[in-house]
Amino acid sequence: MRAVETDGQWALRSPYDGSVQSTIPARNLWIRLLTARIETGEPYIIYIDTVNRQIPQHHKLAGLKVKTSNLCSEITLPTGLDNDGKQRTAVCCLSSLNIDTYDQWKDNAQFVEDVMRFLDNVMTDFINRAPDEFAHAKYSAMRERSVGLGVMGLHSYFQQKNIPFGSVMSKVWNKKIFKNIQEKVDLASKNLADERGACPDAEEYGIKERFSNKTAIAPTASISIICGGSSPGIEPIAANSFTHKTLSGSFNVRNKYLKKTLQKYNKDTDAVWSYITTNQGSVSHLDFLTADEKDTF
């Protein structure tokens, strides 16, 4: 990334012997990566040095290191041989809160803890019932009990409140929401450690945590659709109107909060939606919307 910032060159090295095969401008490579991400959703990108700086303290003390992630890159757990000479295979145990309904549960002290209990129960069930062929995964799950509580619907919540994505107000709400979640997750981990015992990785160093890792932002594309069409993960909505192709057929998907705004102007018509669709889901051409509404959608 420093080479991208300075418009420097980047060496393409052989994965076999590390020799430089070619040198290209770093920004050109970065642009190609971002273009591929937009068009195909891949490749996923992680910053491994940052990941290892942020691993739990007891994993640092144990000399554990993250070498890779899962495909979607939200799970970054230690793999390979640990200090006891045993193999670890990372395990994903995930759930996602719907920020679109944040106002319904934000002040409920028990809600997040209940979700963390659910994840802890799922982890225990996996450890107890997984076949011996999953021995490395069972061992890793037993030692660290890492889970990942994530979210979906962040952009939907902003649109619900008429807050443009990337605005100062959205940044304020972003920090407020995730501070609230993190505080409740941390408390749940300590409460469960008191009740059920700390995970072995943490207990070895006198640290009272039920979970080594607690949060992870997964893409949530499918479950966001199931949850009423909330926006996926923490991503901005790509288009206000688009065709969703499935095995059951093709369906026109329309932004539910834009629909309410159009109804306010008596413009919730097929003609207007068709116009939005032909403009790649954009509303910038709709002259009856205010500047704030255009920024929001």
What do the predicted segments below correspond to?
Residues 1-297:
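Long, C-terminal-biased catalytic regions of enzyme "large/alpha" subunits
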